[in-house]
Amino acid sequence: ALGGLAEKYDLKVIEDAAHALPCSYKGRAAGSLGDVGAFSFYATKTLCTGEGGMVTTDDDAIAERIRTMRLHGISRDVFDRYQSEKPSWYYEVVAPGFKYNMPDTAAAMGIEQLSRAKLLRERRQSIADYYNSQFSGLPIDLPPAAATGDEHAWHLYVIRLQGINPRRDEFIQALADRGVGASVHFIPLHVQPYWRERYQLKPDDFPVAYDVYRRCVSLPIYTKMSDADVERVADSVKLVLASFEQN
């Protein structure tokens, strides 16, 4: 649908694939579904360089435009200090630009991890599979599964507590008391002070988003978790839920 609209109105499709490396959707790699794909390599992402990210495209003109914009609008053609006849200190700004270039050290870490990207995803998949098997039948909603033939990145593993009073904050604290760190992803924008005050919003203005927020808990899922770590998280979740049912 988006592709058809883009073609009709001569638009470019930018795909937010921040968490999706190295997954595929309907046989196509994440980041290749539009004209441009954008990935994040922040510390919590499936491939990490500390900071930074990656842009993919098969359009040479877009690629060159991105290369120029990422470093203050400096053209790589005129910034080649090793082949140009101009002095080494010389450069030209050919367009408005930004400071978006990744440090070489971060890029080197990312290139090395690319060779292990599928292996890292498979470890996350195995953790998610274990959680799913352990949590089946409990009073929680499990994360949506990927469609047949597609892949899930498992950047996060988010459960939703059931019931009229989900007691989410108590649940997270009870896990913490057992040495299991859990978090919430994410807090809806309409309850954040800036948007709430600017647009005079109330929590119930977006009831579905607010209800999911009240119930959601992100459990630990990262590639360096040992099997014992994963089992301890699952056991702790079951014990805390059992204690809630008794109170």
Per-region residue spans from a language model:
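PLP-dependent aminotransferase class I/II
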Residues: 1-3, 8, 24, 60-247
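Conserved active-site segment immediately N-terminal to the catalytic lysine
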Residues: 10, 15-49, 89-94
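Acidic active-site catalytic centers that drive phospho-/nucleotidyl reactions
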Residues: 15-16, 51, 104, 220
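Histidine-centered beta-alpha loop that forms part of the nucleotide-sugar donor binding/catalytic region
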Residues: 18-19, 42, 51, 67-71, ...
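Ser/Thr-centric signal marking residues that sit
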Residues: 32, 44, 56-57, 218, ...
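Short beta-strand-to-turn element immediately C-terminal to the catalytic PLP-Schiff-base lysine
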Residues: 40, 53-58, 111
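Short active-site oxyanion
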Residues: 51-52, 117
